[in-house]
Structure formats: C-alpha cells, structure tokens
Amino acid sequence: TPEIAMRIQRTLGSNIQMVLDECTHYPASKDEALLSMKRSEQWALRSFESYQDLKQDSDSAIFGIIQGGMYGDLRLENLDYLSSINFDGLAIGGLSVGETINERMEVLEQLMPAMPKSMPRYLMGLGTPLDIISAVDVGVDMFDCVIQTRHARNGQIYTHRGVLRIKNAQYKDDLRPIDEDCNCYSCNNFSRSYIRHLFNCNEILGSRLATIHNISFYLGLMANIREAITTNSFEK
C-alpha cells in the first residue's frame, strides 16, 4: 500500500522518497493507460498524506511520479493533478519500458515545457549516455538506472570511444587501461588483459572493477554535462 511504501522509505532514511505508483505497461491502450494513471493518482495523494504524517523533522523530500503511457494528453493531465499536491519534485515514470526512442522523445518533448521550472525533474530508468544527453537537451535534471552495474557484470564497459566488450579475444594481450582518458581506480591499476582474465575465470573482482569504471564514467559524463550547461556550451 502507499502507506507501507512510505513507512519503509522513512525507516530506510531515504533522502528522496517516491510515491507508490503503477508503471503503465507497454504497449497499453489509452483506456488501460488512463485506468493505470488514475490508480497512480489515488496512490500519490495517499503517499503524500502518509509522508506528511511520518516526516517529523526529517530533511527528506518526496517526489510525485508522472504516468500516462505514451499519450501526451494523459501525461499533461497527470502533471496537472500532481502539480496540485505540494511535492518537492516530479519524476517521469513509465518510460524506458520497451518503447522506441522516437516515442520516448515525443512524450518528453510534449511534457517537459509544461513541467514547473522550480522543481527538479527526474526521469526514471534511463539509460545509455546518448539517452541521457538527449533527455538533458529537453530539460531533464536527474536520472537513475541499473545499466552501469548490470552491463558491468556482463563485461560491457563504457568508454569515451564507445562500449568495450572486455570478454572479447582481442583484449587477451591488451595491456592498456580500460579507458585511457579515465582516472578511476580500475583504469589506474589494471589492464584490459587482466580484467578480461578475471571475467574468464569467473572471478568476482572482474565485475567489481568494471562496475567501478562504469559508475566513474557516468559521474564524469554528468559532471561534463553540468559544466557545459554552466558555460553555455551544451549544444556543442
């Protein structure tokens, strides 16, 4: 229930607490998306009321989650409803669930101009570096995704020159770091050849080193995006 969800987040000490919502499946008819959205609206209000009851002196924040499937009018209707509740920020849910990039961007391009500029705007469940850059370009501020760790466990490593699949035979004798433009712990201390060896031996250190690098790469990506926005050079 929304009340249990908020109580768990309060117990965990979550800095940003999310309302309980229903992620609309894809593809969904408009009637299905509307029914799911209305359920999420009811849960959003109950979550907010429970959060207020539990908040006490906590420094936490609560975000609403915008649903509505791939239907721009439903998204805007849901945004209007959530904006009437005193949330600290708004998240965009129900994307990165199997839709095409064009469908996703169409939803974002309809939704983002209507979102309050005074609130953080958080896109849930995205994504690749290109996905993130495209979403920032239309006004998204925050992201979360498991791709950095999930892909690392499978030997897919992000670099400034594209994805490196470390298990491939071409890296057997490659003594270079994963990414010569990276200063993370993995790149400073281990070669591609050694990390490939760890993966081939099913040694957990391999996935840990790949994870450290992928997370470092994404932190650097976001830092570069922030700097580009600050210096008015993002479009370059």
Predicted regions and their residues:
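Glycine-rich phosphate/ribose-binding loops and adjacent secondary-structure elements
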Residues: L54-I178
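Conserved active-site and cofactor/substrate-binding residues in soluble primary-metabolism enzymes
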Residues: L35, Q42, D73, N102, ...
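C-terminal extensions of enzymes
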Residues: D21-P27, D179-K236
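Active-site phosphate/pyrophosphate-handling residues
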Residues: R7, L130-I133, D141, S193, ...
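Active-site entrance/lid segments in N-terminal catalytic domains of soluble metabolic enzymes
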Residues: T1-F87, V97
